[in-house]
Amino acid sequence: MAVLEKFIELVKIDSPSDPASPTCPSTAMQLDVANHLERVMKEMGVSNVRQKDGYVYGEIPATPGYEDKTAVGFIAHMDTAPEFNGIGVKPQIIENYDGGDVLLAGSGHILSPKDFPVLLGYKGHTLVTTDGTTLLGSDDKAGIAEILEAAEILLQGEIPHGKICLGFPPDE
């Protein structure tokens, strides 16, 4: 599964945080992401995958001959910001962006290069946006997707490396 597919799968799992909550994770919905990550990591072949209180951990053992190298850790949080609706995310994928206006179909809002000239730098690339009715949740589900993609590549064993530790906490 490509990184984009991993990302889309993750943003469709509701996981807003609640700053008023006395618990951690602050919302039970974050456990849905934790359970998903635990399952995916085990299916990928990540070692020592475990979950406690919504925190998900795993390891990629060092390749032979690199066991004495310093371990590296990658961490990305699974909650999304509570300041805007994060329930029922409907991502839009715009392949080969043409440099024009981007309609957020659910809200009717438009992202225009006139207002956001940085968009022009993405001409010809794939854009992922929200439909405008929710946030997208790329902070930090994009980070999770990238870490999972890197883990999948490293597990193929063609790139030598020391031990790699993965951590996915709830509540930034």
Residue ranges and their predicted role:
Residues 22-69, 73-75, 79:
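A non-catalytic alpha/beta surface segment that caps or lines the substrate-entry region
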